């Protein structure tokens, strides 16, 4: 501030001197006007001389303000504000440099043209002085005119231009040259002539650098066509561009494949729609007949598609062959699909393979002896009937199965119908798969069961026990695997239908079986508690070994008087029948021979639980010695009945109770919260 005061004093002194000179000049001009022109000229020259020295002095001061002599001037005054004054002067210089050259040129023109007119020149000089002072601080003088110019200059200084203002924006220097804030014209900010400058030299350029400046210009249409074959910028003719796109064939080809897949899958879809076996079943059956392979049904994949209305327990070979033929019968498309070759079985689970192999051996044997041709026509009819009215299917299936059963070699081949019905393949693939002629097959199954009970006791003990009796879904024959109830709901529906064959069922099975059925109705034991052997009493008792016997539902479910009583423990579904225990009248409860096997019986299978009371050993026939040669054997099929080793199966229920107990463990934490709620309620009530 001290500098500014000093400068103001100096400026005020200069301006006062100037004004005095101007006044004297004006007086001389006025006096000379009365005398002659020569005096006027002399005085004007004198006035010029007098006016010039102060103007020169003034210019020198302005120059010092512009920075030529300013450093020296400022260096004379060492003050705290010096650092601030210099940048403000720089900012103001930046703003008013352009005005000063214009003013200088105007001054020269004025000097050349109006030198003779002293009157004009003096005000000009004054104007130039005031204009030049605008480039300074704007505080050069205390005169009212100077004050006006100061106000103007202060108005022109924006907040961002006044360095004392915190909003000041520095615009000088390379760092700020691109700062566009507050600038209307880019030209003011960006240096001119910058763009053409090259940022690198071509001399040290890498050889593989493909960038050429001359190639950066937009290409002409001819060049584009020569390079790309068409004008890539023209969107007017998309047809011309399309053939060059490689995408189009890609789009079309997958669609064709999809169409082919759809065509191939049509027969399967119709098969589903017709309500017949689910699509996977045809696949497994198709593959089965030619290759005689049992589709691995042991993978207990519950694929939700149990078709409840149909219980088909055909032997695998029969079922597969007949389904194969039925497909052909049922429309050209189906025949076509079957001719194309059996599709690979869909669900092939590695776990099932060992079992499948054994079954495959058995069923190959079964397939050879059974002559399919005589059965096929009957089966076709039954198949169509099954589609329309499922109830009648059983009859045709029965006749077919009877013929096949008689022809099959008794021991390993549970009559092919039995093998097929339990062939895990249909079960495995979809547990509704063994559905085709279900009811009809059951009567045939009954007859076959009787034959098997009587004739097939000479069965090879070495045969794997995986061939299950007919009415029992395959999962039952896996000794360890809990049976998958593929058809529980279906059995509930079919309970009434199956009863139609109760008379047939009782033909093969001697009266004791019927008696035991009637007893079953009255005695129901919780299978979890009493799962034990049930023994048929009477002629067939010898053929039916005691241990953990599962009686196919044809034996018992179809009994007209029987109604399922839900046993809470095993009834995973309401259609599951608890294990009834049949006791001959007058006998005290027989003693339990083996620990009760635990496997909830599928609806088709009656699991007869062991009563907790002991069986008298004499009351029941001893179990055949060959039945349990190995305690570890999973299951044995004897006389068409699958026997499970209760020793092994008793282990199965053990894991599940721990699971149940473990669930409460997870539930245990909440009780404190309940206590809290109780406490809160008590507090609220109180």
Swiss-Prot record:
SMART domains: Btz (SM01044). GO terms for biological process: mRNA splicing, via spliceosome; mRNA transport; nuclear-transcribed mRNA catabolic process, nonsense-mediated decay; regulation of translation. Residues 40-61, 87-102, 174-191, 199-224, 233-243, 319-328, 354-366, 392-401, 671-686 have a biased composition (Basic and acidic residues). Residues 1-10 have a biased composition (Basic residues). Residues 127-139 have a biased composition (Polar residues). Keywords: Cell projection, Cytoplasm, mRNA processing, mRNA splicing, mRNA transport, Nonsense-mediated mRNA decay, Nucleus, RNA-binding, Spliceosome, Translation regulation, Transport. GO terms for cellular component: cytoplasmic stress granule; dendrite; exon-exon junction complex; nuclear speck; nucleus; perinuclear region of cytoplasm; U2-type catalytic step 1 spliceosome. Residues 15-25 have a biased composition (Acidic residues). Required for pre-mRNA splicing as component of the spliceosome. Core component of the splicing-dependent multiprotein exon junction complex (EJC) deposited at splice junctions on mRNAs. The EJC is a dynamic structure consisting of core proteins and several peripheral nuclear and cytoplasmic associated factors that join the complex only transiently either during EJC assembly or during subsequent mRNA metabolism. Identified in the spliceosome C complex. Component of the mRNA splicing-dependent exon junction complex (EJC), which contains at least casc3, eif4a3, magoh, nxf1 and rbm8a. Forms homooligomers. This is Protein CASC3. It comes from Xenopus laevis (African clawed frog).
